[in-house]
Amino acid sequence: MKNGRWILLISIFFLLLLGLCIGQKDKLSFWLSSLKEKREIENQINSMNLDEKVGQLVISGFKGETISEELKELIEKSHIGGVILFSSNIKDSNQLIELTNSIKDINSISDGIPIFISVDQEGGRVSRLPKDIEKFPSAAHIGDHGDENYSYKVGNTLGQVIKTFGFNLNFAPVLDVASNPENKVIGDRAFGDNEDLVRRMGLQFMNGLRSSNVISVVKHFPGHGDTKEDSHYELPYLNHHKERLDAIEFVPFKKAIDDGTDGIMVSHIVLKNIDNKNPATMSKAVVTDILRKEFNYEGVIFTDDINMGAIANNYLLRDAVIKTIDAGVDVIVSSKGVEDTKFIIEIIKDALKKGDISEERIKESLNRILKLKYKYSLEDKKLSNINLDKINRFINDNIK
């Protein structure tokens, strides 16, 4: 009997030891993988010229449903980090596939760094998918549904559908708390007027997108749900103190960070009691002190469209670009078109030469951008034509 107990104890000891060794091996494998990634990114950055480095910091919109010579040149020579597509770029499903394939084809012979092909496909009234694709529900509809599993399923289904068309990054979900009924710019784009509901539904939607290997960029930090003004046209101000922001507006974003969100879009909103001179996109107090230091966020930070009225009607583009990068933002999103993007790139290059922006600051953002592209194994692989009936059936079977 005693011998049996000793044998049992010794067996348990060796099993624990084996488990510890396996655990240490897993940790070692993870560490070696991380080290390899870090070295590859460092080598990539060290091999890049100025145009390649600066270009990665910009996502550009463009006009038309095909690749113009100007856009081709922007991808080939300016090495932009990504493009963003809107409804005006999309005619139908076949045209969209041809367009994203063309973008990848041009980029693949450019610098070897895969390109972000992005969209802000939220569902509901913010829909960029071709008209021959079944509609996705709004965030408000998902919030009314109240089922976290449903939110995850919608996010996952959406991710798989947009990936079929060549997109690898989606500026969604909206994590704003719609606490102001007079706010029409957000409204049904939010999951609800309660921070806990927004947190629960938003995080599941985000995780659903990520599970389909699509990058999810949550928005619009620090929270656009209680503003009177629409930042598309004018500069909104929020009078809330930090305590209120921590209790409501910041809640979904903090939880998204805890859940490992890969991207956060910062909005053009002035938090008067934190930085009364600068919108959040241009505020070091918001981007660096709160997002980076207080919330320990290490992912990629994107601007809302820098051409929106909140910025264009109040700031010179040069000042806005320099202050945005100095604040700690990684990627400037510019929807206006190729010429505007080229101007932004020249502003950054000129600021580097004059010392208004440091090379180290650019390298910090570049490291985060490349790390994200590495994490999702982005590639410029062309896609085959889609089966429209199969896609619509997939949507209906999963979320209708």
PLM regions: where:
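Preference for extracellular/luminal or secreted protein segments
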Residues: M1-S78, E294, N314-K400
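Conserved beta-strand positions in the central sheet of alpha/beta enzyme cores
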Residues: I59, I84, N170-F171, V217, ...
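A short aromatic-anchored loop/beta-hairpin motif
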Residues: S60, H79-N89
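Short acidic/polar active-site loop segments enriched in Thr and Asp
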Residues: G81, N168-L169, D262, D330
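Active-site-proximal loop/short-helix segments
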Residues: L129-E134, N168-D188, K219-L235, S267
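A substrate-binding/cap region within the structured catalytic cores of diverse enzymes
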Residues: A139-F167, A172-M206, R210, I395-N398
